[in-house]
Swiss-Prot record:
Its cofactor is pyridoxal 5'-phosphate. Its EC number is 4.1.99.1. The gene is tnaA. It holds the Pfam family Beta_elim_lyase. The modification N6-(pyridoxal phosphate)lysine is found at residue 271. It catalyses: L-tryptophan + H2O = indole + pyruvate + NH4(+). Keywords: Lyase, Pyridoxal phosphate, Tryptophan catabolism. It comes from Clostridium tetani (strain Massachusetts / E88). GO terms for molecular function: tryptophanase activity. Homotetramer. This is Tryptophanase. Belongs to the beta-eliminating lyase family. CDD domains: Tnase_like.
Length: 472
C-alpha cells in the first residue's frame, strides 16, 4: 500500500493522517452480522438501506445528519437547558450565537432544516414560480414542488464529470442563472438557493467569488438569495484552503463574508452544528418577512422561542455552532475524507473529485459500466457495501432524482453516486480503512453484479420508502 504523508502544524514529524483532536469518553458497542444474516436483512428491507434497522448496521454512513457525537460541553449544556415554553434563556443564548457567527438580525429556531424550508418556501413560492439553485437537495426540491413551484438546478457543468478536479465544483453557473431569469421572468423567480456545500454534487464547495457574482445577479433582478447552510463551516474551510486571498482569514471571518451576500439562510443544524436535532431560519434584515415566518412557525413548529425544540436542544445547538467552526476540528474532519479518497485513488476507484466535505461520493457508474441509469448503479453499490461489510450508505443519482412530474418517466441524473457520509466525531481511522477495503473488494467482482428495479414507490421522495428487487 502506498503511504501518503503530510506535515501538520505543531508536529516536526511526518504523519499519515490527521488524528482525532479529542479523547473518547463514552462508547457505544456495535455488532457485525454474518454475511448470510446481512443478505437476509437487506432482502427483508426490500433492498432499501433506509429500511434497515440501525442495530443491524456495522458502520452507518447513510447520513451525517443528526448522527454526530456531541462534546462534553454540549452534554453539560443539555443539563442546563431552560425548558420554559416562552422566553427561555437557552433561546436567547442560541440567538446571540447566530448573530455573532452569521451577522443576521432575525433568527428562528426550528426542529430541522426541512422545517425552515416549509416555513419559508410557502411564503416565497407557489404555482407558476421557480426556485433556481446550484443544486437543490432532495427535501429542498420536495418543498419547492409541494408549494406548486418548479425547481431548476444550475450548477457549473464541471460538476457532472467526477474526474474533473477544480477547487469549487459546487459553484452556481452564473451565466446560466441570468439566462434562466430572463427566460422565465424575474417576477417568476421566487428565490435563488445557494447550497453550501453542494451536497448533491458530492459535497463540493462554493467560492466567495461565486457567492458575490450570484448575489449581484439577484440584486440586479430584485430576487431574494437564500443560503442552504447545512454544511457552511466545511465550505468556509475549503475557501480558506483553496481560494486565493483567504488563507490568512479565520473561519469565522470567512463565514461572515459568505452570509453577507445573502438575504436569508435555512440550516439543518444536524450537520455542522454537531447536534442530533435542530435547525435555523435566519433573515438578515427583512422584518416584514420575519414576522410572516414567525406566524407560520407557531402553526407548524410551536412557539417562536423554542421552534419545536426542547431547551436542552437549543442549549447544545448554541454550543455546537462554535465547536463546528473550530479550525483544528475542521482539519481533522476534512482529513478523514482526504485519507479515504487517497485509498480509493490508489485502488483506481473513481469518486467525485476533489473530495468534498462530509463524505466521499463514489462513482458507481464507473464501477458498474454495464448497469444503466434506470437500474440504479448507485443503489446497487449501496446494497453491495452492506452485504460486504455491514456498511450502510445511500444513493445520490437517478434513483433519488425520481420521475418527471409531467410525463412520469424516469429522469436520468448527471451522475450516479453512492454517498459515504461520515458522521462527525464518531468513527476512527480503523473504520475508514474498512470502508476503503470493502470498496476495493467489490470492485474486484464488479462485473458479476446486476441492477435493480422498483416494485413500489411513493409519489414524493421515493428513495426513503421505495421497495426494490434485483434483476435476474
Amino acid at each position: 500500500m502506498i503511504i501518503y504523508y503530510l506535515k501538520l502544524e505543531g508536529f516536526n514529524m511526518k504523519i499519515k493522517y490527521v488524528a482525532e483532536p479529542f479523547r473518547i469518553k463514552m462508547v457505544e458497542p456495535i455488532k457485525m452480522l454474518t454475511r448470510e444474516e446481512r443478505e437476509l436483512k437487506i432482502a427483508e428491507a426490500k433492498y432499501n438501506t433506509f429500511n434497515l434497522r440501525g442495530e443491524d448496521v456495522y458502520i452507518d454512513l447513510l447520513t451525517d445528519s443528526g448522527t454526530n457525537a456531541m462534546s462534553d460541553d454540549q452534554w453539560a449544556g443539555v443539563m442546563k437547558g431552560d425548558e420554559a415554553y416562552a422566553g427561555g434563556k437557552s433561546y436567547f443564548k442560541l440567538v446571540d450565537a447566530v448573530k455573532d457567527i452569521f451577522g443576521y438580525k432575525f433568527v428562528q429556531p426550528v426542529h430541522q432544516g426541512r422545517a425552515a424550508e416549509k416555513v419559508l418556501f410557502g411564503l416565497l413560492l407557489g404555482e407558476g414560480k421557480y426556485s433556481i439553485s446550484n443544486m437543490h437537495f432532495d427535501t429542498t426540491r420536495a418543498h419547492v414542488e409541494l408549494s406548486g413551484a418548479r425547481a431548476i438546478d444550475c450548477v457549473v457543468p464541471e460538476a457532472s464529470d467526477p474526474t474533473v478536479r477544480i477547487p469549487f465544483k459546487g459553484n452556481m453557473d452564473v451565466e446560466k442563472l441570468e439566462k434562466l431569469i430572463k427566460e422565465h421572468g424575474a417576477d417568476k423567480i421566487g428565490v435563488v438557493v445557494m447550497t453550501i456545500t453542494n451536497n448533491s454534487a458530492g459535497g463540493q464547495p462554493v467560492s466567495i467569488e461565486n457567492m458575490k457574482e450570484t448575489a449581484e445577479i439577484c440584486k440586479k433582478y430584485n430576487i431574494r438569495l437564500c443560503i442552504d447552510a447545512a454544511r457552511y463551516a466545511e465550505n468556509a474551510y475549503f475557501i480558506k484552503q483553496r481560494e486565493p486571498g483567504y488563507e490568512n482569514k479565520s473561519i469565522k471571518e470567512i463565514i461572515k463574508e459568505i452570509f453577507s451576500y445573502a438575504d436569508i439562510f435555512t440550516m439543518s443544524a444536524k450537520k455542522d452544528a454537531i447536534v442530533n436535532m435542530g435547525g435555523l431560519l435566519g433573515i438578515k434584515e427583512d422584518e416584514e418577512l420575519f414576522q410572516l415566518c414567525k406566524g407560520r412557525t407557531i402553526s407548524f413548529e410551536g412557539f417562536i422561542t423554542y421552534g419545536g425544540l426542547s431547551g436542552r436542544d437549543l442549549e447544545s445547538l448554541a454550543i455546537g455552532l462554535y465547536e463546528g467552526i473550530d479550525e483544528n476540528y475542521l482539519r481533522y474532519r476534512i482529513g478523514q475524507m482526504e485519507y479515504l479518497a487517497a485509498r480509493l485513488d490508489e485502488a483506481g476507484i473513481a469518486y467525485q473529485s476533489p473530495v468534498g466535505g462530509h463524505g466521499v461520493f463514489v462513482d458507481a457508474k464507473s464501477m458498474f459500466p454495464h448497469i444503466p441509469y434506470n437500474e440504479f448503479p448507485g443503489q446497487v453499490l449501496a446494497v453491495e457495501l452492506y452485504k460486504e461489510a455491514g456498511i450502510r450508505t445511500c444513493e445520490i443519482g437517478s434513483y433519488m432524482l425520481g420521475n418527471d412530474p409531467d410525463t412520469g418517466e424516469q429522469l436520468k441524473a448527471d451522475f450516479e453516486f453512492t454517498r459515504l457520509a461520515i458522521a462527525r466525531r464518531v468513527y476512527t481511522q480503523a473504520h475508514i480503512d474498512i470502508m476503503a477495503d470493502a470498496l476495493i473488494t467489490i470492485k474486484e467482482r464488479a462485473n458479476t453484479v446486476k441492477g435493480y428495479r422498483i416494485t413500489w414507490e411513493p409519489p414524493i421522495l421515493r428513495h426513503f420508502q421505495a421497495s426494490l428487487e434485483p434483476l435476474k
